[in-house]
Amino acid sequence: MDAKALELLKVFELDDKASLLASGLPYGDQRKLEIARALATQPKLLLLDEPAAGMNPNETAELMDTIRFVRDNFDMTVLLIEHDMSLVSGICEKLSVLNFGQLLCEGKTAEVLKNPEVITAYLGE
């Protein structure tokens, strides 16, 4: 196995699973592997489209830690598209919220999450 690949597996605590097929990994580990694989190309932007889809709350919490780790330790921007607002609020510094393709609100996370239109569209009243 390539040294760079093995190093990324270690960073994401997947090195002990290096000989396993990705399809046999738990869902949370599959997401970590997908992120590690993307990082192997040394991108400047990491686009994550609904990464928490299908995950249970424990897996989502681990995913949040993983994304925070990437955001804080790799020199790149993370663009997150996600409906899980607890994940979004736990990671994002800035938000742009769309509803049916129209921009509802944009700004700092805490401010956006207080916006009445955002609450109605995504958080429920």
What are these regions (language model features)?
Residues 1-125:
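Glycine-rich phosphate-binding loops of nucleotide-dependent enzymes
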